[in-house]
Regions:
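Helix-centric, low-specificity signal for extended rod-like, repetitive segments
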Residues: 1, 34-37, 41, 50-53, ...
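N-terminal secretory signal peptides that target proteins for export/translocation
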Residues: 1-7
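Residues at secondary-structure transition points
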Residues: 9, 38-45, 49, 101, ...
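Short, charged low-complexity linear motifs
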Residues: 15-25, 44-53, 77
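Membrane-proximal N-terminal amphipathic helix
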Residues: 40-67
């Protein structure tokens, strides 16, 4: 009897375990949406940076050739003609393309794909005049 009394308080009761699991589940339910928002914001930043890089490459090409180009692989140094998967083919969240190009201007866009397609900012667009457009005004 003495041994049973000694070991009776060494474990957790089922109620204590259930309360702990409930607290962890509530914390996870609150934290997960916030985490996903942060992930989407990070992907948006990657898309904007890719568009700015494309605009920079177009400006460099224009300064050398006095015309803009739509040839992403030949003239701008990308691996393929487009669309370019952003950030890469294994983690594909945006498609980078030149949607319009002439001797005097260009328009490029980063369109969301896959899990990023539900993002409220939608497609990012930039042109040779550095006009930046997105679905919401606070996205750029």
């Amino acid at each position: 009897m003495n041994i049973q009394a000694k070991y009776r308080h060494l474990g957790f009761t089922l109620i204590e375990l259930l309360i702990t699991v409930l607290i962890v589940a509530i914390l996870a339910a609150v934290a997960y949406p916030s985490y996903m928002d942060s992930v989407q914001k990070s992907r948006r930043t990657t898309a904007r940076n890719a568009l700015l890089d494309l605009a920079s490459r177009e400006a460099k090409f224009y300064s050398t050739n006095n015309t803009f180009t739509s040839s992403m692989n030949t003239d701008l140094g990308y691996a393929s003609a487009g669309p370019i998967a952003i950030p890469d083919a294994t983690s594909h969240y945006y498609d980078l393309t030149i949607t319009a190009s002439s001797a005097t201007g260009f328009t490029a866009q980063a369109a969301p794909v896959g899990p990023q397609a539900t993002d409220g900012c939608g497609t990012y667009t930039i042109d040779n005049l550095n006009s930046k457009v997105a679905a919401q005004s606070n996205c750029w």
